[in-house]
């Protein structure tokens, strides 16, 4: 064929089939791919730019109502005007307001935080001076705050306490921070080092000393600064005054008062010692019975990485540095256990997916080998390898990391990527059969041109089907965006390689045929034999449909039958034979046991509950080891980031990080293990009056809880009543587990009410009384040692731990009057015993409560649990006798006039994802239709070509049912891709020039 009659594809093939630059381009593509594999950061999860921040406003002494009305509500109104805000949450507790600002997915972190800081600084008048609030504290959080590595230090014997281990961990922090790519290195656990000044009320009164005197002595004595220069002997001498307090002995030797002409030292009225603070948290490491079954005091070092860094490299470098520190910074009898290594799990996941990618490629090459021959298979295999490598480079250039989603995109599209090369090679092979006497360089341009137009159209149709998915909103959007983007880029690059490199390889590797010694090809014979065997079956099936007499009736019956099958397929999810859920569970190596004791539970009782839970976990064969955290939170994962587990620091809170054996050493999946252990763990929790929840790492974007019911109402009493009724429905519903709500259990509260009139008559200020009581019970860091510690060592004024429950000792403390006399606090306060106030939760400027739960059992999709409760919830009546209004998509417009329930959790993200993917599906179908119309010049023919698309339901839904697989977002992606796999092949024939459409 003359080059003047060739289309764009034929001309490209003619240009590059003998060009010397073609092998260079192929080599560059290969090297770019190898470069991308080496430099692309490897992570287990894709990077999601989701920014949230906590704004904490302390309001000491304020009631919940004051905190809500005077701080939280004005703050919400200020924060909600920031551009890019998704939600504003707040919780008002006694003395503290916590506002959580959640930005929309995709808003750049720096931009979001700059807007937040600017807005707060520009609106400081919402916290007027003198109100009593402290400076707002902004704590931003994002995906990079999730530690990739956790190192737990424990003693091999019983020689080291948590205090000793904390000192070792703090010494390690600076060395680990020197590793390139690390972001934060933080020690969790340990009591912290301090100079404890334990007050002795009797000796203080005997010596005429108050807490204010001790505070003043510490602060005034710990003062030093440069005071200037002095000229002496014709030289300038730098002059300083001081010195600072440098040791516990310096503190003990301070003179705090002069009594009867004699100095009163700090050691005379308090016990001064350097050591750990009173325990406010416990951390310990436990091993399974198979590994000894022991528990040891521990601390954990968590390491986060900078954005864009390779998790594998950072984790490997940190562990190498730890090995270097052993024997020097780390004592020989201290063991370091790697309790989290997301670098290793990311590497394992990447290796596994790359193996699957290679297997898929080998399968395609093997298929071509058996149908076309070994030379053709080698050409297709080379084209596929080049396509994959250059696609990896394009993915890196786009900004994607190498994670399970981006690699899944390549595996998912491997069958599509090979189509272009196979079509070109097969048509060149066919033209060799038709023109055995012509040299390959003359055959190739025409053969490529013949299928070039349909191949371009086929590529565009697949891109049209997939690319709209890149615009899915919410958390799932950036989570799944590598799939449509990588697959679309791969399709374009596959087309370029098919037109540029494949003709060049075909000219070199395919054996030329001549007219007299042409080797017969096995493929046509096999194809002909297969056609001969299938022809009677096709005639038997399709003849009744094409019959002139009975054909119309049979076609109507067939249409009704197909419609019925489609209808039955659609009904499968409704009947529960095919479960609908966001994503299938992954086989993880960890899960958490989250424990909530009744509010007011002492730390020691929480620890006792965790010990009992740990003793049971040690007997589980699949458990390798665990770490228990009482009064503090374990290193968070992405799930904990969204659920704000990092704020769990009360004495009644705890959790256990459970680490399972490697997947290769256990048969059960992590989800099955967690489901199996939940009943026993919750039974142990019930014995301790604890709410125990088993929290798994979600396979996709996390939510506050899988099932969330948000309760809106006009007043607190109504919301509490409806919340309790909804919780009871949750508890009665089979399969609904891990039930909790935002209310707290009734707990005692003691109020020391100052008699202002009497205090004024005695010359004592209320501020002195409150400050004295606060220092005695909570402790007060009156000053700090200057001892070159990384973390400043506070001098902590406080009653001894043994006297914390002794009200007489507390009220024995005195305050100094304006006349200098000591006034015992018991003379100016009245003790009231009341209950703790309930916190108030708000979302997007509306007060609300939440009931949260998970779903477990045979039907573990939260959607089915949610819908199964609707009938019972509709029976609930408000105090006015009205039903509770249900909302599924948006919150109620006016929560002050009605009681409403808004379903959230996994339902919300599932709805948004499938809504957007359904819209993407529709847009893809429209684009495919327009492309095919442009190709055929007909508005009817494309409808005939696209008619089989709905038939995919007949295969997809029953297939999921047969395999007991849930229909997930990835299933939806597969359905969308099926709509785009329309390969248009033009086959030139002497008698017929009609296009052949292969669906």
Model-predicted segments: where are they?
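Signature of alpha-helical transmembrane segments and their immediate interfacial
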Residues: 3-42, 451, 521-581
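Transmembrane alpha-helices and their membrane-interface boundaries in multi-pass membrane transporters
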Residues: 134, 413-428, 452-471, 478-525, ...
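Hydrophobic transmembrane alpha-helices and their membrane-interface caps
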Residues: 35-39, 362-429, 471, 489, ...
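Solvent-exposed, membrane-proximal periplasmic/extracellular interface segments of envelope transport
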Residues: 5, 14, 68-140, 202-223, ...
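C-terminal transmembrane helical bundles of large multi-pass transporters
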Residues: 342, 378, 680-988
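Conserved small/polar residues in nucleotide/adenosyl-binding loops
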Residues: 653, 986-993
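Membrane-proximal extracytoplasmic
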Residues: 2-361, 402, 478, 698, ...
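Helix-loop junctions and hydrophobic alpha-helical segments within the transmembrane domains
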Residues: 339, 346, 350, 425, ...
């Amino acid at each position: 064929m003359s080059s003047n009659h060739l289309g764009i594809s034929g001309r490209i093939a003619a240009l590059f089939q003998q060009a010397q630059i073609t092998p260079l381009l192929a080599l560059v593509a290969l090297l770019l791919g190898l470069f991308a594999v080496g430099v692309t950061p490897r992570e287990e999860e894709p990077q999601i730019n989701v920014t949230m921040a906590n704004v904490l406003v302390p309001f000491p002494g304020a009631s919940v109502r004051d905190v809500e009305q005077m701080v939280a509500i004005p703050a919400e109104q200020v924060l909600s005007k920031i551009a890019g805000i998704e939600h504003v949450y707040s919780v008002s507790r006694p003395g503290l307001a916590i506002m959580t600002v959640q930005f929309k997915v995709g808003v750049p972190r720096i931009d979001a935080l700059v807007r937040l800081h600017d807005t707060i600084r520009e609106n400081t008048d919402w916290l007027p001076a003198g109100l009593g609030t402290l400076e707002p504290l902004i704590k931003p959080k994002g995906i990079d705050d999730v530690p990739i590595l956790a190192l737990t230090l424990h003693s091999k014997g019983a020689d080291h306490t948590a205090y000793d281990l904390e000192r070792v961990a703090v010494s390690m922090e600076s060395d680990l921070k020197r590793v390139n790519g690390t972001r934060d290195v933080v020690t969790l656990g340990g009591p912290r080092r301090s100079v404890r000044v334990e007050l002795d009320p009797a000796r203080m009164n005997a010596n005429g000393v108050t807490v204010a005197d001790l505070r003043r002595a510490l602060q005034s004595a710990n003062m030093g600064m440069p005071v200037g220069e002095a000229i002496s002997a014709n030289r300038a001498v730098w002059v300083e005054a001081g010195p600072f307090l440098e040791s516990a002995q310096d503190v003990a030797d301070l003179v705090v008062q002069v009594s009867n002409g004699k100095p009163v030292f700090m050691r005379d009225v308090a016990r001064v010692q350097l050591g750990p603070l009173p325990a406010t948290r416990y951390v310990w490491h436990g091993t399974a019975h198979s590994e000894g079954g022991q528990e040891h005091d521990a601390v954990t070092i968590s390491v986060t990485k900078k954005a864009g860094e390779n998790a594998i490299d950072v984790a490997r470098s940190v562990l190498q540095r730890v090995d270097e520190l052993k024997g020097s910074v780390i004592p020989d009898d201290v063991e370091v256990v790697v309790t989290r290594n997301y670098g290793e799990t990311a590497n394992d996941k990447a290796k596994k997916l790359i193996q699957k990618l290679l297997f898929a490629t080998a399968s395609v090459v093997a298929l071509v080998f058996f149908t076309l021959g070994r030379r053709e298979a080698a050409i297709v295999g080379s084209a596929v390898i080049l396509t994959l490598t250059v696609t990896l480079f394009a993915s890196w250039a786009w900004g994607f990391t190498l994670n399970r989603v981006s690699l899944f995109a390549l595996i998912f599209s491997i069958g599509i990527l090979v189509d272009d090369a196979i079509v070109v090679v097969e048509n060149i092979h066919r033209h060799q059969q038709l023109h055995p006497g012509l040299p390959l360089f003359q055959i190739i341009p025409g053969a490529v041109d013949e299928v070039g137009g349909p191949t371009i159209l086929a590529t565009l149709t697949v891109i049209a089907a997939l690319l709209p998915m890149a615009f899915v909103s919410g958390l799932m959007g950036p989570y799944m965006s590598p799939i449509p983007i990588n697959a679309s880029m791969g399709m374009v690059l596959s087309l370029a390689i098919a037109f540029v490199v494949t003709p060049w390889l075909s000219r070199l590797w395919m054996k030329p045929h001549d007219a007299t010694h042409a080797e017969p090809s096995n493929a046509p014979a096999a194809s002909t034999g297969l056609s001969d065997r299938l022809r009677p079956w096709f005639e038997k099936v399709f003849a009744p449909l094409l019959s002139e007499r009975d054909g119309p009736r049979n076609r109507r019956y067939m249409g009704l039958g197909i419609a019925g099958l489609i209808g039955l397929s659609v009904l499968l999810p409704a009947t529960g034979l095919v479960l609908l859920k966001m994503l299938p569970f992954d086989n993880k190596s960890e899960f958490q046991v989250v424990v909530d004791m009744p509010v007011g539970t002492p730390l020691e009782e929480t620890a006792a509950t965790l010990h009992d839970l740990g003793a049971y976990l040690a007997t589980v064969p699949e458990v390798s080891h665990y770490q228990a955290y009482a009064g503090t939170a374990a290193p968070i994962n992405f799930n904990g980031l969204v659920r704000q587990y990092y704020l769990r620091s009360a004495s009644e809170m705890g959790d256990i990080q459970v680490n399972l054996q490697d997947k290769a050493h256990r048969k059960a999946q992590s989800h099955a293990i967690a489901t199996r252990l939940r009943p026993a763990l919750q039974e142990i929790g019930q014995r301790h009056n604890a709410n125990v929840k088993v929290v798994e790492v979600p396979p996709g974007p996390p939510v506050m809880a899988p099932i969330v019911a948000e309760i809106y109402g006009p007043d607190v009493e109504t919301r509490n009543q409806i919340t309790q009724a909804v919780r009871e429905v949750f508890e009665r519903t089979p399969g609904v587990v891990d039930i909790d709500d935002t209310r707290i259990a009734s707990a005692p509260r003691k109020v020391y009410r100052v008699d202002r009139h009497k205090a004024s008559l005695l010359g004592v200020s209320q501020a002195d009384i409150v400050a004295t009581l606060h220092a005695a019970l909570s402790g007060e860091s009156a000053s700090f040692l200057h001892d070159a510690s990384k973390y400043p060592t506070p001098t902590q004024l406080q009653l001894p731990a043994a006297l914390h429950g002794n009200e007489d000792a507390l009220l024995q403390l005195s305050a100094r009057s304006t006349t200098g006399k000591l006034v015992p606090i018991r003379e100016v306060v009245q003790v009231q015993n009341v209950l703790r106030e309930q916190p108030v939760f708000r979302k997007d400027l509306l007060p609300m409560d939440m009931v949260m739960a998970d779903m477990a059992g045979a039907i573990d999709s939260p959607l089915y649990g949610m819908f199964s409760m609707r009938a019972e919830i509709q029976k609930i009546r408000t105090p006015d006798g009205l039903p509770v209004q249900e909302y599924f998509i948006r919150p109620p417009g006016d929560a002050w006039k009605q009681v409403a329930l808004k379903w959230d959790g996994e339902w919300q993200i599932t709805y948004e994802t499938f809504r957007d993917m359904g819209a993407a599906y529709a847009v893809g179908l429209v684009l495919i239709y327009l492309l095919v119309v442009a190709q055929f010049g007909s508005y009817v023919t494309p409808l005939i070509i696209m008619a089989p698309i709905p038939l995919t339901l007949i295969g997809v839904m029953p297939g999921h049912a047969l395999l007991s697989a849930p229909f997930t977002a990835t299933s939806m992606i597969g359905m969308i891709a099926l709509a785009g796999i329309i390969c248009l092949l033009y086959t030139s024939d002497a008698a017929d020039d009609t296009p052949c459409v292969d669906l």
